[in-house]
Curated annotation (Swiss-Prot):
[4Fe-4S] cluster binds at C17, C21, C24. It comes from the Bacteria. Keywords: 2Fe-2S, 4Fe-4S, Biotin biosynthesis, Iron, Iron-sulfur, Metal-binding, S-adenosyl-L-methionine, Transferase. This is Biotin synthase. NCBIfam families: bioB (TIGR00433), PRK08508.1 (NF006308). It comes from Wolinella succinogenes (strain ATCC 29543 / DSM 1740 / CCUG 13145 / JCM 31913 / LMG 7466 / NCTC 11488 / FDC 602W).
Length: 279
């Protein structure tokens, strides 16, 4: 019986991003009806961290909108990380703040951040079809920098953007070269406000993506994230049988997730336990 690791997301800043990622509701290039705000207060962030830990999460990811981790974001995320660590919540802290220099990443690590999340999103060859304002190489270099300063690396991406199987294999091979500790797996859900004209993945195709990810990344924490509820509904057991061993608990960046208690009950009904320690 395997233990399922739970991670919660805190959307520290929302919307207004100048990048043109075709899958992203936070891009200012598209008219998407989402909640927009500059920055949550430290009190709100700490309260979300407490709720996440009480719900069973071991990971807590601090996410900011925008292309990169500038000096102001570095200082604020560092302050938030210190507050959470000082509260003794025993959470594995992840920061997700875009492209970053080694100096900024080292500062986060010094202040209590354990891992950095920066998704490759898709294959290098396919990336120009979904984003023109920055390069895939910039993403890969940030992942390398996170590893170089001693942070854990969390990097994955989105299936169902219009890519084919050859691009999926290329993407998974690129992830393999980074040996990430954690790999978020998302399924794109079509949104009429975004420019991508694709259909949602069928369940079997989505499952094959998970099986391949597990084959390429046998020791990674494979974390199912956005799109699982839309693609699978309550019939999610095959995801875990295909190799998923971690779940994003609660809400996502701009969309609602299931209630944490419902997801935990569902996971246990499949015969799995909830992880009680990071390892």
């Amino acid at each position: 019986m395997k233990d399922i690791f739970l991670c919660s997301i805190c959307n520290v800043s929302s919307g207004g991003c100048a990048e043109d990622c075709a899958y992203c509701t936070q891009s200012a290039k598209y008219r998407v009806d989402i909640e927009k705000y500059k920055q949550k207060s430290l009190e709100n962030i700490l309260e979300e961290a407490r709720r996440a830990r009480a719900s069973g999460a071991l990971g807590f990811c601090l996410v900011t909108a925008g292309r990169s981790l500038d000096s102001a974001k570095t200082a604020y995320i560092s302050e938030a990380a210190r507050s959470i660590k000082e509260a003794g919540l025993e959470l594995h802290l992840i920061a997700c703040c875009g492209s970053a220099t080694k100096e900024a990443l080292a500062e986060l690590k010094k202040n209590g951040v354990d891992s950095y999340n920066h998704n490759l999103e898709t294959a290098k060859s396919f990336f120009p079809k979904i984003c023109t304002t920055h390069s895939w190489e910039e993403r890969y270099e940030t992942c390398e920098s996170a590893l170089e300063v001693g942070l854990g690396l969390c990097t994955g991406g989105i299936f169902g953007l219009g890519e084919g199987w050859s691009e999926r294999l290329e993407f998974l091979h690129a992830l393999q070269t980074l040996s990430p500790h954690s790999v978020p797996v998302n399924f794109y859900i079509p949104n009429p406000s975004l420019p991508l004209e694709v259909e949602a993945l069928a369940q079997e195709e989505a499952l094959e993506c998970v099986r391949l990810a597990r084959e390429y990344l046998p020791s990674a924490r494979l974390m199912i994230a956005g799109g699982r509820e839309k693609v699978f509904g309550q019939a999610q057991k095959p995801l875990f049988e295909a190799g998923i061993n971690a779940v994003v608990l609660g809400d996502y960046l701009t969309t609602k997730g299931n209630r944490p208690s419902e997801d935990i009950a569902m996971i246990r009904s499949f015969g799995f336990e909830i992880a009680e320690a990071c390892h």
